[in-house]
C-alpha cells in the first residue's frame, strides 16, 4: 500500500507547515547550489541560508493556512487571505532573522550596548 505524503500532511496545520518547509527549502537549496557553483557563497553560507528559508517558508505556509481557515469565504477570499498572511509571516520572519544576525555580528557584549539601544538603532 503506497504512502501519500501530501494528503497526510494536509490534515493538520503543522503538516501543512512541513509541506511548505519542504517546498521552500527545496527552492532555497536549488538557489544556493547555483550560487555555490558560481563560488559566490561558501558551503556554510549556503547551509545557513537554506535552513533559514526552510523554516521561514514552513512558518509562513502554516500561518497562511490558519488565516485562510479562520476567514473562510470563497476561493478568491481564501487565496487572498492566504497570500497576505503568508507574505506578512515571511516578512516578519526575515526581519527577525536580520535583527538577530546583526546583533550577533555586532557583538553586543563587546560594545556594551543595551538591548534597547540595539533595537532603537535597528528600527531607525
Curated annotation (Swiss-Prot):
User: Which portions of the sequence form the region MIC, when fused with the C-terminus of maltose-binding protein (MBP) or expressed as a fragment, improves quality of iron particles during precipitation experiments, binds magnetite?
Assistant: 36-56
Q: Does the keyword Heme apply?
A: no
Chain segments annotated as transmembrane: 9-29, 65-85
Q: Per the record, what phenotype accompanies loss of this gene's function?
A: No growth phenotype, magnetite crystals are slightly smaller with a wild-type surface. Deletion of the probable mamGFDC operon leads to a slight reduction in magnetic response and slightly narrower magnetite crystals.
Q: Which domain of life is it from?
A: Bacteria
What UniProt keywords are attached to this protein's entry?
Answer: Biomineralization, Iron, Magnetosome, Membrane, Metal-binding, Transmembrane, Transmembrane helix
Q: Name one GO cellular component term.
A: magnetosome membrane
Where is it localised?
Answer: Magnetosome membrane
Which Gene Ontology molecular function entries are recorded, alphabetically? metal ion binding
Write down the membrane topology.
Answer: Multi-pass membrane protein
Q: What does this protein do?
A: Probably involved in magnetite crystal growth. The lumenal domain may bind the magnetite crystals, affecting crystal size and shape.
Q: Its quaternary structure?
A: Probably interacts with MamA.
Protein name, as recorded: Magnetosome protein MamC
Q: Which organism is it from?
A: Paramagnetospirillum magneticum (strain ATCC 700264 / AMB-1) (Magnetospirillum magneticum)
Q: What is the lineage of its organism?
A: Bacteria, Pseudomonadati, Pseudomonadota, Alphaproteobacteria, Rhodospirillales
Which gene underlies this protein? Answer: mamC
Amino acid at each position: 500500500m503506497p504512502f501519500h505524503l501530501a494528503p497526510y500532511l494536509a490534515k493538520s496545520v503543522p503538516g501543512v507547515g512541513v509541506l511548505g518547509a519542504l517546498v521552500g527549502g527545496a527552492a532555497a537549496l536549488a538557489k544556493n547550489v547555483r550560487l555555490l557553483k558560481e563560488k559566490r557563497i561558501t558551503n556554510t553560507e549556503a547551509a545557513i541560508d537554506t535552513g533559514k528559508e526552510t523554516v521561514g517558508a514552513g512558518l509562513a505556509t502554516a500561518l497562511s493556512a490558519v488565516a485562510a481557515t479562520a476567514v473562510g469565504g470563497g476561493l478568491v477570499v481564501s487565496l487572498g487571505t492566504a497570500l497576505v498572511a503568508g507574505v506578512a509571516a515571511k516578512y516578519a520572519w526575515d526581519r527577525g532573522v536580520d535583527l538577530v544576525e546583526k546583533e550577533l555580528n555586532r557583538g553586543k557584549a563587546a560594545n556594551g550596548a543595551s538591548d534597547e539601544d540595539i533595537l532603537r538603532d535597528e528600527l531607525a
